[in-house]
Amino acid sequence: MHKLVDTCDYPGFAMLVYRRGEVVYEEVTGMMDVATDQPLQKDTLVRMYSQTKPLACAALLMLFEEGKFLLDDPVSRYIPAFGKVKVFAGMNLGGMRLVDPERPMTIRHLFTHTAGLSYGFDPQHPVDRLYGQAKLIDLVSYGQMPLAEMMEQLAQLPLVNHP
C-alpha cells in the first residue's frame, strides 16, 4: 500500500482485517485530500465502488467452507441456462460467429473474472455492444428485473472469450 501511495498511483488506503470477532490488522496511509494535504484517518468517510464483489465472494466462500459447492463446479449446475452458452469467435458475412466453449464455465472462473463475461465497456467490440444494449445490470439495480431473470438473459449473450 505504501508503495502505491508513494508513487502517486493512489492518494491513500485504509485496510482493516477482522477475524473471529477481533481486529487482526489495521493500517491507514496516504491522503484524504491531496490538494489540502489532509491525511487519511481511520474515521475518514470515503466513497466505495464495486463492493458487492468482495461481499458476495466472502459469503460464497463461507458456503464453500461448509461444503455446499466446489470451486470447479460448473455454473450450469446452479444456473442451467449457462450450459448452453456460446463464445464469440469473430465476425463473418452472416454476423457473429459463435462456438461452444472449450471448457465449462466454473465457479472458480467467476471468482477470478475469467468466465468470459463482458463488462460491456468497449462500444467497438460486438459482444460488448450486446451487453451494453441489454442493460441487464441497470434493470436489476433499479428493481425492474429479478436477478434470476437477469441470469437467464445473461446466459443468452455470447461470452467475449473462452472460460
Please place each PLM-identified region on the residue numbering.
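Beta-lactamase-like hydrolase cores
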Residues: 1-20
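A cytosolic small-molecule/anion-sensing beta-strand core signal
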Residues: 19, 25, 65
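Gly/Ser/Thr-rich helix-start
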Residues: 13, 31, 117
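Short hydrophobic alpha-helix segments
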Residues: 27-29
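Generic structural motif
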Residues: 20, 32-34
